[in-house]
Amino acid sequence: MEEISLPLLTKMSSERTLAVQAALMQQPDKSLALLAWTLCLNVFGSGAYSKPAQISLECKHYSLTSDAPSGKEGAAFMALMAEKARLAALLPEGWSRDMTTFLSLSQEVLLSLLSFCTACSLNGVQTRECGHTSRSPLDSLETAIGFHMRDWWQPTRGNYFGALKKQQIIAALNEAGLSDAAWDAEKMKKGDAAEHAEFHMKDNRWVPGWMCAPRPQTDTTERTDNQANAA
């Protein structure tokens, strides 16, 4: 992964974070489990609290949409904002000044609010220190919710391939099982190779390996999933 530039790492891990947020939002049971687990880390771990309900949530949508190539026009962010608008319309009048207004909400609405807010708290932006790239904190969550990046993102020259070196574009085509397309790209200039890759990747499910959760070592068949879908 270290061959991927830090700016591209930031851009694509931001894109990935928004996509996982949108996917988690659609699975309230998994979102609630994540919330409970996160709270238990504090409750059953070390440390004591002198104030009730010391819970905090930080939504990173501003920085995520600033860094992600799709910005505010991406499918994931638009889905998140559509759900936010739907839920905002269900909030009781004066809710921000009086907690008891939430007592009138149905369990269904409360669950939707918990699920959405938990999803918005995700932050999977990766960093690089001393030449070592941090592991994505989204890996195990993605596996739990059956997440696939291509449900929310389409690789293009503008949002991905154009930021790669020519040999990385060729490697991506080979990784996707498109050896003939990779061979043709060898003879092209970088810009043409990026467009070439966009065209040949448009109908498959390929995702850069470094943007995916690690596959179980015992499952050799899943490791060829990209190639099988690209064939």
State where each predicted segment sits.
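C-terminal helical accessory/scaffold domains
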Residues: 1-190, 201, 209-231
